[in-house]
């Protein structure tokens, strides 16, 4: 479906049309990241378990995305600049350390049959669509177990997905999580994402400029391509229960 949009889409400028047809880039993304961790009994701050788990998950996502694009290439042909690309010569796979048997087979299939799309994965914020699907937004932690959020002029009550007596203790507030762990998790995912991720940084008024700079340096060291918003909040301001009702 995403590939078909390229041919059916309306392009406001000819340059966008030329580029889209040339590389056939799509932006296959994910949502419900924090929800997924909690469903697998992993707390965000449990760094080793967290990073190991998502490294495997996003490797699988990338593998099946490439495989699907390879199958499309057999049917419809490769994107026009495939020949001589990192996909064609195998550098894409070498750069990411994809050396297992299944990856070697896929690398050979891509070389032989091509790839329909030059770019595959990109993680969007999914702030609104996650509400519809009943999960957490994008790859961000939840802001609280229950809170009010403004969406297009309306106040929407939000409750952490799947909240119960067990998951209550697994969910962690975005503003109390060590942001350096979030950046390293972002780096673990980035290895498998050829484009970028919409990742927010959550800070409190107690943060110093040095701490904020260190978060950005951690992101850079982890290989993160880009960050989204820096969201600030004072932890001393408590939500009013009567106002919330």
PLM regions and their residue ranges:
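Internal maturation/activation junctions in enzymes
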Residues: 1-17, 42-126, 215
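Core structural elements
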Residues: 1-5, 19-41
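Glycine- and acidic
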Residues: 11-21, 38, 42-55, 166-172, ...
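Flexible domain-boundary/linker segments
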Residues: 19, 50, 82, 86, ...
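Catalytic alpha/beta core of large soluble enzyme barrels
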Residues: 2-8, 92, 96, 109-116, ...
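Residue-level recognition of conserved structural "scaffold" positions that shape functional pockets
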Residues: 34-36, 48, 134, 145
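Conserved active-site and cofactor/substrate-binding residues in soluble primary-metabolism enzymes
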Residues: 21-31, 52, 56, 60-67, ...
């Amino acid at each position: 479906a995403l590939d078909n949009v390229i041919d059916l889409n309306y392009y406001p400028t000819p340059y966008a049309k030329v580029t889209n047809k040339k590389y056939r880039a799509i932006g296959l993304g994910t949502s419900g990241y924090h929800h997924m961790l909690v469903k697998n009994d992993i707390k965000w701050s449990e760094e080793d378990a967290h990073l190991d788990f998502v490294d495997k998950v996003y490797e699988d996502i990338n593998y099946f995305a490439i495989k699907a694009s390879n199958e499309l290439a057999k049917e419809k042909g490769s994107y026009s600049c495939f020949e001589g690309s990192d996909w064609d010569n195998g550098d894409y796979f070498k750069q990411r350390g994809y050396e297992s048997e299944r990856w070697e087979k896929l690398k050979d299939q891509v070389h032989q049959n091509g790839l329909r799309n030059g770019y595959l994965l990109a993680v969007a914020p999914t702030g609104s669509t996650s509400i519809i699907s009943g999960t957490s937004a994008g790859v961000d932690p939840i802001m609280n177990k229950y809170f009010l959020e403004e969406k297009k002029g309306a106040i929407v009550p939000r409750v952490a997905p799947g909240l119960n007596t067990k998951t209550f203790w697994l969910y962690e507030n975005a503003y109390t999580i060590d942001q350096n762990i979030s950046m390293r998790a972002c780096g673990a995912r980035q290895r498998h994402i050829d484009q970028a991720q919409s990742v927010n940084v959550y800070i409190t008024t107690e943060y110093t400029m040095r701490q904020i700079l260190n978060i950005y340096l951690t992101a850079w060291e982890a290989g993160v391509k880009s960050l989204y918003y820096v969201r600030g909040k004072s932890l001393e301001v408590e939500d009013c229960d009567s106002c919330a009702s």
